[in-house]
Every structure is written in C-alpha cells, then in structure tokens.
C-alpha cells in the first residue's frame, strides 16, 4: 500500500510542476485536479454523444479532425470538397 501512496505523491509533485500526469487532465495543479478534470471531460463527451446520437457525434468529430491552426474544419472541408452533413449535429428531441 505504501508504494501506491508513494507513486501518487510522485505524480502529484509532477502535476504541481506543470506536467500532465493523467490523460485528459491537462491544466490541473495537482494529481486530484488532473483526475477530476479528466473525469469531467470524459463525462461531458459521453453526455454530448447521448444528446446528438452516435451518428451526429461522429460527424462532428470528422469535421473537428479536419481543423488546423490555419483554418477551421468547415473551411478545409469546403476547400477540399469533403461533405460534412451538419444536419446530424442537431440534438435529439
């Protein structure tokens, strides 16, 4: 059990130094903050998927995946002739 506490202590120290120690926990100032941020981001994505449906959520991800620092996903899709069906983005009633 002590090794688990020691590992958490090391991770907490790294988090306080600005290192990301939990996937999705970027921006937290401690290990606990990293864990809470990661959990909230995951839960937010799941909620959005439920609201939009699997198809809409996937389509939104396709568009987001096309974005770059220079242009949005929508701009790039239009320029390259990639069809993005934004009607799928609507939340379910």
Swiss-Prot record:
One of its GO terms (biological process) is response to abscisic acid. Belongs to the small hydrophilic plant seed protein family. Residues 9-19, 31-52, 73-93 have a biased composition (Basic and acidic residues). The keyword Heme does not apply. Pfam families: LEA_5. Keywords: Stress response. Residues 1-93 are annotated as: Disordered. This is Em protein H2. Induction: By abscisic acid (ABA) and osmotic stress. Wheat contains at least 10 different genes for Em protein. It comes from the Eukaryota. Signal peptide: none annotated. It is thought to provide protection for the cytoplasm during the desiccation stage of embryo development. PROSITE patterns: SMALL_HYDR_PLANT_SEED. The gene is EMH2.
């Amino acid at each position: 059990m002590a090794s688990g506490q020691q590992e958490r202590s090391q991770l907490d120290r790294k988090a306080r130094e600005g290192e990301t120690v939990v996937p999705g926990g970027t921006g937290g100032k401690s290990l606990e903050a990293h864990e809470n941020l990661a959990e909230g981001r995951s839960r937010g994505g799941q909620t959005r998927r439920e609201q939009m449906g699997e198809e809409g959520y996937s389509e939104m991800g396709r568009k987001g995946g096309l974005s770059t620092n220079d242009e949005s996903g929508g701009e790039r899709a239009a320029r390259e002739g990639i069809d993005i069906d934004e009607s799928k983005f609507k939340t379910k009633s």
